[in-house]
Amino acid sequence: MVNMKSVALIVIVMMAFMMVDPSMGAGECVQGRCPSGMCCSQFGYCGRGPKYCGRASTTVDHQADAAAAAATKTANNPTDAKLAGAGSP
């Protein structure tokens, strides 16, 4: 028969599993990148949730970020567009 110590241990273990943060990480970022759907925190670890995807983190899609930054730079600096040949006859 199950004694009270066993029941208490089972309850404690179950409660510990429930208290685990659902945004737990999945290891370190590799060259600033994480598996799909995860973000790289400011400290270099992958995960989900505000601790990883907050303002101080980098997003998974670095290529889209770089393209948007380049487009903004070109739009804000017409000299770059001329040097790139934009608007040439």
Curated annotation (Swiss-Prot):
What domain of life does the UniProt record list for this protein's source? Eukaryota
Database matches in SMART domains: ChtBD1
Q: One MF term from GO for this chain? A: chitin binding
Secretion signal span: 1-25
Matching Gene3D superfamilies? Endochitinase-like
Key word Signal present in the record? yes
Q: Name one Pfam family in it.
A: Chitin_bind_1
GO BP of this protein: defense response to fungus; defense response to Gram-positive bacterium; killing of cells of another organism
InterPro entries assigned to the protein according to its UniProt record, in alphabetical order? Antimicrobial_C6_CS, Chitin-bd_1, Chitin-binding_1_CS, Endochitinase-like_sf
Q: Where is the Chitin-binding type-1 domain?
A: 26-68
Keywords attached to this Swiss-Prot or TrEMBL record, sorted alphabetically, are:
Antibiotic, Antimicrobial, Chitin-binding, Disulfide bond, Fungicide, Plant defense, Signal
Q: Which cysteines are joined by disulfide bonds?
A: 29-40, 34-46, 39-53
Is this entry keyworded Signal? yes
- Propeptide, residue positions: 56-89
The role this protein plays is: Chitin-binding protein that inhibits the growth of the fungal pathogens B.cinerea, F.culmorum, H.sativum and A.consortiale, but not that of R.solani. Induces morphological changes in the fungal pathogens F.culmorum, H.sativum and R.solani, but not in A.consortiale and B.cinerea. Has antibacterial activity against the Gram-positive bacterium B.subtilis, but lacks antibacterial activity against the Gram-negative bacterium E.coli.
Name the chain's protein. Answer: Antimicrobial peptide Ar-AMP
What is the species listed in this Swiss-Prot or TrEMBL entry? Amaranthus retroflexus (Redroot amaranth)
